[in-house]
Amino acid sequence: MKIALVGYGKMGHIIDKIAQTRGHEIVARLNESPTLENLNNPDVVIEFSSPESAFGNIKFCLEQGIPVVCGTTGWLEKKPEIEKICIENNAAFLYGSNFSLGVNLFFALNEKLAQLMKPFNNDYDCQLEEIHHIHKLDKPSGTAISLAQDIISNSNFEKWKLDETLGKELGIRAIREEEVPGTHIVTYRSEVDEIEIKHTAFNRNGFALGAVIASEWIIGRKGNFTVKEVLGL
């Protein structure tokens, strides 16, 4: 499979190595906007750029009919438009706030816990915390937003908000610290006890491997997809 990497930062470099060990060819490594010339006729694009660049990058590739696997966060207000462009061009688009198997199992655990806690929302206050390296541009992380959305769908919360809150707003505390790959904590606290679930990434390899597996999976498919469908969760 021929892969074009759009966004060649730390994640791009790790994806490059993992993809090659799985027998794939990297035909483009881009930190600039994609064109037909510099993409070099790939079977799929893996997009890990920046919040500012993601929309334009994805839009261009989908309009050429090239499948896109995207892990860039911080641009999701435009995701419905991208999904529409994907359908209009009979293309394939897969977005993941996190491609790690462990995180996606954590998503499922978080959703189940939220369902169990719903009858007790008046007794327990729920808060989220995410910790990432100082180079991460967006706050909160896409993973934290995904966790929050699953909690909101299964609770009395109406929306999430950055920083601690009370009432109908679900608080997300975002910390930027040294070179932390990613830690996410969901806490339910009452006057008498506390329930906590936590996921800690030790490096970026799990994210990168998941992105490569997603790019293998999307070949031959049409439509908008998520990591859950790739992993069968």
Give the residues covered by each predicted segment.
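C-terminal substrate-binding/catalytic lobe of Rossmann-fold NAD(P)-dependent oxidoreductases
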Residues: 2, 10-39, 122-233
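Rossmann-fold NAD(P) dinucleotide-binding segment
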Residues: 51-71, 80-82
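Short, acidic/turn-prone active-site loops that include or flank metal/cofactor-
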Residues: 32-34, 72-76, 99
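Rossmann-fold NAD(P)-binding glycine/threonine-rich loop
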Residues: 72-93, 104, 109-112
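Short acidic/histidine-rich motifs immediately flanking catalytic phosphotransfer sites
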Residues: 39-46, 62-67
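Rossmann-fold dehydrogenase core element
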Residues: 67, 82-100, 117, 121
